[in-house]
Amino acid sequence: MGQNLSTSNPLGFFPEHQLDPAFKANTNNPDWDFNPNKDNWPKANEVGVGAFGPGLTPPHGGLLGWSPQAQGIITTVPANPPPASTNRQSGRKPTPISPPLRDTHPQAMHWNSTTFHQALQDPRVRGLYFPAGGSSSGTAYPVPDTASHISSIFSRTGDPAPNMESITSGFLGPLLVLQAGFFLLTKILTIPQSLDSWWTSLNFLGGAPVCLGQNSQSPTSNHSPTSCPPICPGYRWMCLRRFIIFLFILLLCLIFLLVLLDYQGMLPVCPLIPGSTTTSTGPCKTCTTTAQGTSLYPSCCCTKPSDGNCTCIPIPSSWAFAKFLWEWASVRFSWLSLLAPFVQWFAGLSPTVWLSVIWMMWYWGPNLYNILSPFIPLLPIFFCLWVYI
């Protein structure tokens, strides 16, 4: 049994094939059968002391192999002391004191000398001390040979860092304005087409608008009268309608601007005073009666009678332009004066009439919204002009 060279015994259960660390069976000599420290098989029945008490470990060692500890012999092996530290000289050493400037840069000691300034007249020597783009003055300042104060570390050198928040807001503001302007422009460009659709729908009540030019001498495919191709006879009428619509929008913006300027007091419109023939605008320095209040804008109108003296009256804060237009139109169109009693009567109506008007507006509101919806993009522009002008 012990001569079986083909049977491995890594755990030491068999008497002739025990694991022996001293024999180095695990490293250089893997042959378990030529272990010189083998026990005879009859001694395996004897009771040995063992490492864990009597009878727990056979004399040959069993699982523990052949070792003094397996035979119950406890030997105290002193531990080797730790090696002396070899890192005592490592780490950051103190910075040595810098040598004097006269030893490291002897040429710096001559910067303030006359010979050095004469040598600077040579472009080749000057290029060594003043590179391209540097100072062009003829005075050179040597580096002092003493260390500067520690507070100089925190001192400013050069231009301060730019404020990124202000730069971002400076770019973000114009971009937002540009985006809002482009959005309003795209919406405004749809106003003529929407008004053109509403205009052409008046000719096709109860049906879909169809271009009437498709059955003429130059027939085209079925299309809307608001999108006629250039070869369609209705193309000229479409351009004419849109031109009128553009003029109407321009007139609307002009009226709003005039009302706004008048409301701000920047449009000196003088109402016609009964009994006066001429009016003029200007400062009230030569007037016999001063206007009430002071403002940076023209705030008074001067009437000049025949005697040469002028009388100043305040310009109304609002609706002066409307009053001027009404008076101007009443002088040239006498029939407009007949509307004044009707307007006064309408303004003095009872609340019941006003409620009926409100109910009618509620009933016709959706249709009015469809008519006025193309003008909604103009409202933000009017609001901005009203606030910032």
Swiss-Prot record:
Residues in compartment: Virion surface: 2-170, 264-337, 388-389
Designated name of the protein: Large envelope protein
Domain notes: The large envelope protein is synthesized with the pre-S region at the cytosolic side of the endoplasmic reticulum and, hence will be within the virion after budding. Therefore the pre-S region is not N-glycosylated. Later a post-translational translocation of N-terminal pre-S and TM1 domains occur in about 50% of proteins at the virion surface. These molecules change their topology by an unknown mechanism, resulting in exposure of pre-S region at virion surface.
Positions where lipid (N-myristoyl glycine) attaches: G2
Region listing for Pre-S2, in residue ranges: 109-163
UniProt-listed GO biological process terms: caveolin-mediated endocytosis of virus by host cell; fusion of virus membrane with host endosome membrane; virion attachment to host cell
UniProt-listed HAMAP family: HBV_HBSAG
Annotated segments matching region Disordered: 73-99
Modification after translation: Isoform M is N-terminally acetylated by host at a ratio of 90%, and N-glycosylated by host at the pre-S2 region.
Glycosylation sites: N309
Species for this entry: Gorilla hepatitis B virus (isolate Cameroon/gor97)
Family, per entry: Belongs to the orthohepadnavirus major surface antigen family.
UniProt-annotated stretches for the region Pre-S: 2-163
Region feature (Pre-S1): 2-108
Top-level taxonomy: Viruses, Riboviria, Pararnavirae, Artverviricota, Revtraviricetes
Function: The large envelope protein exists in two topological conformations, one which is termed 'external' or Le-HBsAg and the other 'internal' or Li-HBsAg. In its external conformation the protein attaches the virus to cell receptors and thereby initiating infection. This interaction determines the species specificity and liver tropism. This attachment induces virion internalization predominantly through caveolin-mediated endocytosis. The large envelope protein also assures fusion between virion membrane and endosomal membrane.
